Amino acid sequence: MMLKLVLRAQRGMRAFAGIGATRKLMLAAEASAPSSVAEASSIFAKVGRDIPLKVVPRAERRAARKAAKHSADAATGHKVVRTSSLPARISFALLAGSISGSIVWNFVLDDGIKSRVKETLGATFLGDIYAIIAKKVEETVKPFTDPSRQKLLPDWPIPQVPADTPTVPVLVLDLEDTLVHSEWSRKHGWRHAKRPGVDEFLETLCQYYEIVIFSQNYGAEEIVQKLDPKQCALHILSRDATRYLNGAHVKDLSNLNRDLRQVVILDDDPAAYQLQPENAIPVTPFTNGRDRDDHELKDLIPFLKALASERVPDFRQVIGEFRDEDGVVRDLATKYGARVHQLEMQKEQKKKKGFGGFVRGRLSHHPASPTGGVAASGFSSGPHVLKRWTLLDSSAYVVAPRCIKEKCM
């Protein structure tokens, strides 16, 4: 035991002596600052040979390197020229300011504020300068705000149907939180839950509509392939087909290359159809993938079938009949079902009246007709939309739906 203590004491004394010698050499190096490249090189050689490099403080090593570099510059005649960083900072600030201003102007401010700014600047000498700058900025950001092409859908007839096929209505369906709900977790990654009734919805309405699935995100094709394996949807559009307006990616139906009177869109986000709200049927967002009791899509099937099968001239008129006082369509399927039930009750009452009711109706100068139904929305040709429809009755209309039906059934 005593022997171990003695050996440890000897090792400690040797280490202390080594540190003392190292410190002496470092002090000597500091006292004699290198005045030439040779002296600086000798110091570095001495540090590597006699003084362990790891015990030399970093500040002292940096001072030795600076002294050696200064001596080398003095020996070769090179002069260190200091340049000011102020111009570079000013240029960077101007660039960052212009980019930030463009983003705020095109993606944050609404049209009302923009118009007021234009009027104010137009009344001053800065009006012409503003017009030139605004035009350049608009040309720069246009690829990021406008749809990637003017015609989002090909001309009718599309390649999937015969050339003599008459045009059919267009049903635009939002993907996120309307047909599917997507969520991400660290354990499972991305998972997509189909809304209940989406299969029946697509397979039924593809007989009546040219279905377009419109997503606000990229990569919608992979989701739609799993969602719609029978390819009932004829077109898939992604974010590049949207128009960025008022901070939202808007689905501009005017770029569909179809008659807007025969277009209807289902979406859970009012900002997505802000350019054509009269064509929209709002739906409740599907945000709980575990909810298997949702029946909104299934409830809308009867109305959408009747809307297409009755050859309505303008869908917007019919949808407008279901708007509330604030101009928003709510619970359309419920309201439509109530009107259908009301007309059925009226039909039953007429049957009960018998022959007397028939005679009174013939003698009347103003035959009774149901009021408050979809038929009161301004179109008189064709049967009432609220009647019990017979599927695929009109041979003049169902040529195209049958062609489309063969694709997905």
UniProtKB/Swiss-Prot annotation:
Sequence ranges on the Mitochondrial intermembrane membrane side: 110-409
Signal peptide: none
InterPro entries in alphabetical order: FCP1_dom, HAD-like_sf, HAD_sf, TIM50
Location within or outside the cell: Mitochondrion inner membrane
Alphabetical GO biological process terms: protein transport
Any matching Pfam family: NIF
Keywords from the UniProt entry: Membrane, Mitochondrion, Mitochondrion inner membrane, Protein transport, Transit peptide, Translocation, Transmembrane, Transmembrane helix, Transport
Residues in FCP1 homology domain copies: 164-307
Parts of the chain on the Mitochondrial matrix side: 64-89
TM region(s), chain numbering: 90-109
Transit peptide: 1-63
Membrane topology: Single-pass membrane protein
One GO cellular component term noted in the UniProt record for this chain: mitochondrial inner membrane
Source taxon at top rank: Eukaryota
Principal localisation: mitochondrion
Function: Essential component of the TIM23 complex, a complex that mediates the translocation of transit peptide-containing proteins across the mitochondrial inner membrane. Required to direct preproteins in transit and direct them to the channel protein TIM23, and possibly facilitates transfer of the translocating proteins from the TOM complex to the TIM23 complex.
Assembly notes: Component of the TIM23 complex, at least composed of TIM23, TIM17 and TIM50. Interacts with preproteins in transit.
PANTHER family hit by this protein: DULLARD PROTEIN PHOSPHATASE (PTHR12210)
Similarity annotation: Belongs to the TIM50 family.
Protein name: Mitochondrial import inner membrane translocase subunit TIM50
Source species of the chain: Phytophthora infestans (Potato late blight agent)
